[in-house]
Amino acid sequence: SLFFYSYFPIPPQQTHEAGVFLREIAKRLLVGLENKLPDLQDRINHIFTKQLFGIAITRLTSLLSRRSLYCSKTADGKYSICDCFTNNDGNVKFDNIKHTWNEDLRCQFCGVSQTQETYKRTDMEVFAYQFIHTYNPEEIFNMKFDVIIGNPPYQFNVGNTSGNSSKAKAIYHLFVQQAKKMQPRYLSMIIPSRWMTRSTEGIPDEWVDDM
């Protein structure tokens, strides 16, 4: 999952899957903004609608993240502690998008093969993660973010039957690339360190050099 955070006041201009990062940031903001926004409900509404945003990697993790953050799986639900959302998602997005296939029958964004049933099925999620399946990640929320925190999926087990995880196709570097495009002041991603050895399948040398 990916989590986005803007400071208060917002300057001119993705926890793990259960939304823990967002929840812990919210707890600190509730304390830190007490003098600026003394009314608790006003403070909650401001933090959840103006400062904290997330992208879930599956529908299930979107529901878990909203429950962790808003105390309700729907942001505008009866039990949500934020009382000004007018949609189910709030600021925790999940869109079940599809892969975009090129002439080689591979996704032009993440590189998975159309020959694998998991990624071309129409009735279930296909793991076309929204953040990396766009050329313009900044348009997902149309905002400038000060901080981006992520715990992205590490890899696709594409044709890997050896049990050697280093031979699976890495995708975590794509999340780092997209986050850097958004030019946050701070970027923190939980990713494996294997890229340093240049031995991970799918990670180009150019990306390692840039890191």
Say what each PLM segment does.
Residues 1-211:
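SAM-dependent methyltransferase catalytic region
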